[in-house]
Amino acid sequence: MTMLWLAVLLTCGAPAALLPTSGVGCPARCDPSSCSPAPTNCQSGETALRCGCCSVCAAAENERCGEGPEDPLCASGLRCVRNGGVTRCQCPSNQPVCGSDGKTYSSLCRLQAESKAVQGRGVAAIIPIQRGDCQQGQKDPDSPRYKYNFIADVVEKIAPAVVHIELFRILPFFKREVPAASGSGFIVSEDGLILTNAHVVTNKHRLKVERSDGSTYDAQIIDVDEKADIALIKIKAKGKLPVLLLGRSEELRPGEFVVAIGSPFSLQNTVTTGIVSTAQRGGKELGLRNSDMDYIQTDAIINYGNSGGPLVNLDGEVVGINTLKVTAGISFAIPSDKIRKFMAESHNRQSTGQGTKKKKYLGIRMMSLSQGKLKELKEQVKDFPENTSGAYIVEVLPDTPAEEAGLKEGDIIISISGKTVTSSSEVSEAIKKEGTLQMVIRRGNEDIPISVTPKEIEF
């Protein structure tokens, strides 16, 4: 018995102690004839006396329970606990719980007691459906959900500074605006400077920016670096805006967690996560011969419309701009070190008042088919054509010469004006130098001739 009491004390702690359910003072034999009449309408149900002989109404929560042979036991689910010299029935859990009747109960035991009572009146049983208050739920800082949901912590921190960008064009015949495309961006200054991809804002008449709180603004293009695919736009807002700061992409490690956030298909703050495959995927590996930039490769999904959104580390710092999805599990981001350089150069350009530039624009995003990239694509894409070279079209932007000519995502440009294409840089040069381009593209196992004329636009 001494060991039993010691175990009880160690389990429950002082000064409270669980009482034994049987023991000293009980008769050797039960004599039912000595029991009082069986109880009826017990709100907490029936139970036997501590000696297990006569039936009595069970003690409800906070009611006194027995130390002696003639004292009642607690109702099912309750424990008889001595605390400060008084023994009462207590619920093992004192956390509130929400019932199926929409009411909040102080404990699960209280809900169960009420359920028994209403069932006795022919009403449906009340079941627990949620921990905590019906209106607020339960917030437990020590639960795994709060302790280990680091991705949610990052998203909560950065989401207010991520914006949705909607792009409009004018229909010449009807003389009215229609939505043309959408993308993402993030605020980098309290007075409204926003970073995004250059291809997001190219060839559009008007930009509308929507913040996570639903407020909308017209935006103005401030600066564009087409080669780096970075653009700076600006909105005019009242008051200071939340901003995101740049991290150092050079410090990224393969295997590090990253979070991509944006607004694909106009869905605000869509979040994907992944790891860094490499922080230094050279542009030349992607077939961008004129590129001196190393891209961040990640398996975080970057969908259409996610372009221009931030890729952040677990500290909530921007380590890249989401820019390119080749296929599932292979996406690329412009590193923050390149963004930092663009911002400095843009500041200098604005200070010196450099004017706008003109360029030819086709409306595709592409990459060269190196041997390594061919192998990756054949593993990822079913029925990938048996090509050894060419420019692989990753994306065709809406309302562009490329779309109007019939180019599609997944097409491979294999020749222009009769000359074999071996890299995306050759296509870029042809766009700059030639007028109408006579292309042959491979779609599946079919070679298709397509004629497309680039459009000249201002930046």
Swiss-Prot record:
GO terms for molecular function: growth factor binding; serine-type endopeptidase activity. Induction: Up-regulated by FGF4 and FGF8. Residues 344-446 form the PDZ domain. Serine protease with a variety of targets, including extracellular matrix proteins and proteoglycans such as biglycan, syndecan-4 and glypican-4. Through cleavage of proteoglycans, may release soluble FGF-glycosaminoglycan complexes that promote the range and intensity of FGF signals in the extracellular space. Consequently, facilitates inductive processes in the developing embryo, such as posteriorization, mesoderm induction and neuronal differentiation. Regulates the availability of insulin-like growth factors (IGFs) by cleaving IGF-binding proteins. It comes from the Eukaryota. The keyword 4Fe-4S does not apply. It holds the Pfam family PDZ_2. Residues 74-136 form the Kazal-like domain. PANTHER family: SERINE PROTEASE FAMILY S1C HTRA-RELATED, SERINE PROTEASE HTRA1. This is Serine protease HTRA1. Forms homotrimers. In the presence of substrate, may form higher-order multimers in a PDZ-independent manner. Residues 22-92 form the IGFBP N-terminal domain. Belongs to the peptidase S1C family. GO terms for biological process: positive regulation of apoptotic process; programmed cell death; proteolysis. Residues 1-18 form the signal peptide. It comes from Xenopus laevis (African clawed frog). Its main location: membrane. Coiled coil: none annotated. Keywords: Cell membrane, Cytoplasm, Disulfide bond, Growth factor binding, Hydrolase, Membrane, Protease, Secreted, Serine protease, Signal.
